[in-house]
Amino acid sequence: MRKPTRFSPLLFIFITVFVDLLGYGMVVPLLPFFVQRQQGGATAAGALGSLYALMQLISGPAIGALSDRYGRRPVLLVCLLGTAMAYLMLGLAGSLAAIFLAIMLDGITGGNLTTAYAYIADVTSLDERSRGMGLVGAAFGLGLMAGPALGGLLSANGLSVPAFLACAIALSNVIFGLFVLPESLPVERRTAAPAWRALNSAAQLMDLFRPAPIRWLLVSIFTLNLAFSGLQTNFPLYSQARFGWNTLHNGVFFAYVGTCAVLVQGVLFRWIQPRLGEKRLAVGGLGLLALALAGIALARQDWLMYPVVGLAALGSGVSIPSLTALVSRRVDAGGQGRLMGGSQALLSLTMIIGPALAGVSFEVIGTGAPYWLGSVLAAIALWIAYVALRSRPAIKSPV
């Protein structure tokens, strides 16, 4: 039996998520260049993102249900080990098929954040939960801030170098979790062996929306993620077409975005949440996000990107953890893993749809179209959340 630790479980999960996202941030911006190295084009590079999201859509609910049955720690360790193997395969890949297999494996075992959010729900009280979710968001932002810069620097020595280092980082995370990370879900709170329905993404997505206390909040989260999901892949094209930015400028800008995410979710959110509450932050954050996305669509000078996207980081940084915590409050302890797994599947669904919407609107309508679309979707998410939070009591559901 492992000795109980005197450190906060939140610190452990923060380190786990940060190290995981550090490796992710090192590799993902370089994927188009891995494809180019094998004579692939933009279509193949875009297909990689869709494949990753599709694999997460299939595996997300199963990972959540398995963590409810067997505990968060073993599931998290298996996911991290799968990530390490995927990065190793990517570094060694000598064909497009090998690259696709690596991304497929990474997507299937990409339940790290799903399990991390369930872990947070296990170790925090209802009042502390949104701050715990915000801490995960801060680790996410910090990893994505440092990862792309480190990956870009190392890629000067060859594209495979960042992939191999990301593999080593993921393996170190496995060792950290094996010897240091405590289990968060006691045996008495675990569920029975999951039925086939619990491992089926489509069935679990339908089950996810069935409980009335969380249905409309989940619709709001889905709409919010749909507003965002296509913009990450579209922004470099937008900034190049409108402002003439190159890859270096985009890299600096994404580091700035990561810094904003860390400051908002790691510092500001923890201070402001007890003062304003999750409901106000969810609604207010969605309003700021809708305004910021409209600002991106209207901008004609590149310096405006920094304050406007900073506003978007503020809006998303307070609304996403608040909505996640509000949904989590309405689900009992035995259903947290299924909730987070279903939520990850929901996110993956938007990651399949969103990039296509952004790409088509960008090419057919104009450079600002994806951001107008995102602004409208954020406004719809705001309206749905406002109505749901005004009328729904916090009644717990088993999911």
Per-region residue spans from a language model:
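Juxtamembrane intracellular "pre-TM" segments in multi-pass secondary transporters
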Residues: R2-F7, P182-V219
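Short amphipathic helix-loop junctions that connect adjacent transmembrane helices
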Residues: P29-T43, T233-H249
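Helix-breaking motifs and short loop linkers at transmembrane-helix boundaries and internal kinks
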Residues: Q39, G71, L92-A97, G244, ...
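Conserved MFS/SLC helix-loop-helix module at the cytosolic interface between two early adjacent transmembrane helices
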Residues: L57-L96
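Helix-to-loop junctions at the C-terminal end of transmembrane segments
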Residues: G60-G71, V264-E278, F362
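Cytoplasmic helix-loop-helix junction between adjacent transmembrane helices
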Residues: A102-G141
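Helix-loop-helix hairpin linking two adjacent transmembrane segments in secondary transporters
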Residues: V136-F179
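C-terminal transmembrane helical hairpin of 12-TM major facilitator-type secondary transporters
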Residues: K279-L323
